């Protein structure tokens, strides 16, 4: 089952990981070993989850690094599909 418009995975970090535990962005950044700006950009949908961040999120909150990356991939693909009609490619096979 695919979602037509999956949310940015940074929202999952904010609403499923940080807020339920009462963790601020500053505290979360320290837990994850990243800068406050990096985590702030992620939870405000301005940055993507990298493979390294996926590992950090898994170590801190669980869920599996692969799951975090799948959330990001689903979001990225949905964004790209919005513009698929503008992509001009000649089919060769």
Regions found by a protein language model. Give the residues of each.
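Short, basic-rich loop-to-helix N-cap that marks the start of a DNA-contacting helix
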Residues: 46-59
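Short alpha-helical DNA-recognition segment
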Residues: 22-41
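DNA-binding alpha-helical recognition surfaces that contact promoter or target DNA
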Residues: 41, 55, 70
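A short, Lys/Arg-rich alpha-helix, primarily the initiator
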Residues: 1-23, 70
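Alpha-helical DNA-recognition elements
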Residues: 41, 45, 74
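Short, charged recognition helix plus adjacent turn
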Residues: 63, 67-93
